[in-house]
Design a protein with these regions (language model features):
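WD40 beta-propeller repeat fold
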Residues: 2-205, 211-230, 234-247, 260-278, ...
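Intrinsically disordered, low-complexity regions in plant nuclear regulators
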Residues: 302, 314-317
Length: 367
């Protein structure tokens, strides 16, 4: 077991167990479970700046390397668009889709982001919705780049179906994270984007308009809706300086925006976070000190109140409760974390110490 839990909670609180630890010879950019399998994908950058994609399978209490493939550029982010098709963003601004059973030729490849004059620009974040994955309707992929642009792609065409960027090129900020949500029908899509200056923006794809924006005061490392395929409920935002924000998306106040709760976590940057697929009110956060923490969001008695003077509805934020002791998973910052969609509590973690770890978090179904 790893992590600490008080004696009073030791019989009921979730516990962290390391299933296997795997050293790699590259810097991991992202890890993802291959849908419906006991295998996971690890992608990153080799010392010579080439990209590498590896598939590992859990078997006999170990991680066994199934395949390893080199690609031209270092991989920065990934998302599965079908059970065996993965979309990769790289350090040279390309978006590529590969079949995990063959990486010799991409199924789709386009330069998604580039600076003026064709200068090098990386894809900083990626997400997808629709197709055979979460949500309904056609497959759409969103990418955010260091050129300050957020673009939505349909793999059936090589041009973006939507591009969000500031009119003034001097105001462009690095986009560090993107996420889809609100995919309740074939036409309904909402995307969230976080930027290095703390900006958080929500856009509606159906109307191609910015719905809401705010500033989290610190660079935004991760945004994630609690579910992609339901009506908007909550948005999780993690930032530099150890901050976590959870916005209640049910009620938008014209002046105050969405209500949110603020929490200070870890002792450094909260690099990433992930909602538990089996319970959208539970999520894990990963810190710059290598810590992993589990939280549960608790709703208030009333999520909406009326302003006595104007009569306008205002949201009421909930509270965050740590439900497990902090686990010292790695010696360096945790770069990527992914829950298994079918096995509650099974997770894979990648950190900057060039190590992949498969963890089992127990008792989550009892929370």
């Amino acid at each position: 077991m790893i992590g600490e839990t008080s004696r009073a909670d030791s019989l009921t609180a979730p516990q962290f167990a390391e299933y296997h630890c795997q050293r790699v010879q590259y810097t991991t950019g992202d890890v993802q479970w291959v849908p419906g399998t006991a295998s996971f994908l690890s992608a990153g950058t080799k010392p010579n700046d080439e990209g590498i994609v590896q598939i590992y399978q859990l078997r006999d209490s170990r991680c066994h390397l199934v395949s390893s493939h080199s690609v031209p550029n270092g991989i920065t982010c990934s998302t599965f668009v079908r059970d065996t098709h993965v979309a990769l963003g790289d350090s040279d601004g390309f978006l590529s889709i590969f079949d995990v059973e063959r990486f010799d030729q991409p199924l789709f490849r386009v330069r998604a982001h580039a600076r003026e004059g064709g200068r090098k620009c990386r894809v900083g974040a990626i997400d997808c919705v629709g197709g055979t994955m979460e949500g309904v309707g056609a497959l759409e992929i969103v990418t955010g780049g260091s050129d300050g642009c957020v673009r939505v792609w349909d793999p059936r065409t090589r041009s973006p179906v939507l591009c969000l960027e500031p009119e003034d090129a001097k105001q462009r900020r690095d986009c560090w994270t993107v996420a889809f949500g609100g995919a309740t029908s074939a036409s309904e899509r909402v995307l969230a984007a976080g930027f290095d200056n703390g900006d958080v923006k929500l856009a509606c794809l159906r109307t191609s308009k910015l719905v809401w924006h705010s500033n989290a005061r610190n660079g935004v490392c991760k945004v994630q809706f609690d579910r992609k395929d339901t009506a908007l409920n909550k948005l999780l935002v993690t930032t530099l300086e150890s901050r976590i924000r959870v916005y209640d998306l049910r009620t938008l106040h014209q002046q105050e925006g969405f209500a949110y709760t603020l929490w200070k976590a870890h002792s450094g940057t909260v690099w990433t976070a992930a909602h538990l697929p089996q319970n959208r009110d539970i999520f894990a956060t990963c810190g710059g000190n290598g810590e992993l923490t589990i939280y549960k969001y608790k709703y208030p008695r009333e999520r909406v109140i009326k302003d006595k003077q104007t009569g306008e509805k205002r949201g009421v934020p909930g509270t965050l409760q740590p439900v497990a002791g902090k686990a010292d998973v790695a010696q360096q910052p945790i770069r990527s974390f992914a829950w298994h969609r079918d096995k509650c509590g099974l997770a894979v973690v990648a950190s900057f110490d060039q190590t992949l770890r498969v963890l089992i978090v127990t008792r989550l179904s009892n929370l």
